[in-house]
């Protein structure tokens, strides 16, 4: 390293560095990494000052070498490199003549143009950490900090970089060259790892006692102490590690990096086949509600009481008929199941006191619909291991499905506003700190934008259904319990409203493991004629059960009312997450918050109010075949919420895989847009891992279609 320093740096810089080290009692021949660091730092300080002058009008100008600068004043006073006494004399003189406050530590430069001292930092570590250490040590707003790293990054106080871009680029290029030269001689790793943080009293603390013992116990295998582990992590060079591993692998492994250009990516291949079908646990845009306003009946709040009252508001019941059969099911059983529900609700009404819960009679149509006695008998393995042809039963490969337009319509509908408010967030109490005030202000603005959103209705509906079903599954394991599908909201005038969407009948539910399945039959009201999009309703048997009179601009119109019936299933873990669907509100609020934070850091003040109240500004919402769609901040809030809700409603392994794998391609494309010249290897393998998730799930297929739109417009 010493030889490298003497070859690489100007002899004057080497001499100054040696003098500085001797002044502090350090030996350049022993502490060679420190020797190199001091030379680098001095060279950066001199380059910072080079060619910068102040003319007779007090303007900062750049004079290239060879041009006349005899009458010009140097813009920067160099303090770094002087002996301590002389350096402090210069600093005191500057303070006396300019009135600038005296710094606690010796700075590196003084800027006569901006009238401030400058502390220059050159780091081999993470630039933000080094900057914070410097700021912690100096603790002065008078001294301007400017940090350079060997990777071409820089950071300065208030993002004020003092010099023009070309001067800074010269410094960065020189640092990069030093790094390359060191690396070619095998000196870089040792030099990089030798840097210590800025030592300040506040940071010099030891982990001792119980915490130390816990830290030593919590290490990965093969590490004896926390210090060993820290040393390993600090010295870990991921690229070198990966290259080393690759070199140990077979010769057939080809990891040649290919440049990723605008012409490189191709669209994702979406599967062909019949159109995909609706697979959510309850109806979304097609749901119909029977409701009561300002409920005040006896037992109000008890689901069965509320359901009976809602059923009484409808007078158009008629003899049910099948209008769209289920291809593989015994449709008459679904019809009989609905008739049984109607009859048993009538029985409830005839009783003097309505029961709190209703268990259905175990009729043969219900037993069939709920899969009673259909599960294969479990046999102990020891009893059958001698069977010669023992094998796992064959399972069919999933059938490929194509994207259908209904899922985009569902998403659009979820982003819309309804005429009711679905959110009643509890009061959290008075704010006691400024940050709490900002947080509640953001929460209130966000709540105002999404409380009437249809996606919020889906959240409340999902929470109710999953909670009721999980409770019933645990409390009445053997019963076919009737569970009303209910939600509550407030009208624009503030009146309370109770809504009934239909009913669920729960099957046997001895759920020992999280993934054990409970079957249920859902029966949901709707005005949607299933014959318009029969492919959407593949899994349903649909009955016509009545006529509903609707008020329209041209008078009253009678529309047929349908009942969408299907057998479905869920598990404890799915119900547990369904009960926590309110998390979607938090997730989308955090996404909005990060947008506000980005805006606030640019403007250096909190922009929450302006962000939500500037109605004229539009924001990007998403990609469509037409290009980037834009909308108000409210539309952005509702779109982000709807995406989060659909991720919950359509959760699946296909979605998990697609999200994880497509994110990699997205990051590469974004790097290309940011002119970072990304390189890739095995791009075909990445496409394969994305496309193997595109099978039949409607939400995944829609996301893949959006991704293709993004690729088209991002790479124009």
Swiss-Prot record:
InterPro entries in the cross-refs: INFV_PA, PA/PA-X, PA/PA-X_sf
Pfam families in UniProt: Flu_PA (PF00603)
Keyword Nucleotidyltransferase on entry: no
Similarity comment: Belongs to the influenza viruses PA family.
Function in brief: Plays an essential role in viral RNA transcription and replication by forming the heterotrimeric polymerase complex together with PB1 and PB2 subunits. The complex transcribes viral mRNAs by using a unique mechanism called cap-snatching. It consists in the hijacking and cleavage of host capped pre-mRNAs. These short capped RNAs are then used as primers for viral mRNAs. The PB2 subunit is responsible for the binding of the 5' cap of cellular pre-mRNAs which are subsequently cleaved after 10-13 nucleotides by the PA subunit that carries the endonuclease activity.
GO BP, one annotated term: viral RNA genome replication
Top-tier EC class: hydrolase
Record's subunit section: Influenza RNA polymerase is composed of three subunits: PB1, PB2 and PA. Interacts (via C-terminus) with PB1 (via N-terminus).
Stated name of the protein: Polymerase acidic protein
GO cellular component: host cell cytoplasm; host cell nucleus
Gene Ontology molecular function: any one: endonuclease activity
Amino-acid positions noted as binding Mn(2+) 2 in the UniProt annotation, renumbered to this chain: 80, 108
Entry keywords, A to Z: Cap snatching, Endonuclease, Eukaryotic host gene expression shutoff by virus, Eukaryotic host transcription shutoff by virus, Host cytoplasm, Host gene expression shutoff by virus, Host nucleus, Host-virus interaction, Hydrolase, Inhibition of host RNA polymerase II by virus, Manganese, Metal-binding, Nuclease, Phosphoprotein
Entry comment on modification after translation: Phosphorylated on serines and threonines by host kinases, including human casein kinase II.
Organism: Influenza A virus (strain A/Swine/Wisconsin/1/1967 H1N1)
Chain segments annotated as coiled-coil in the UniProt record: none
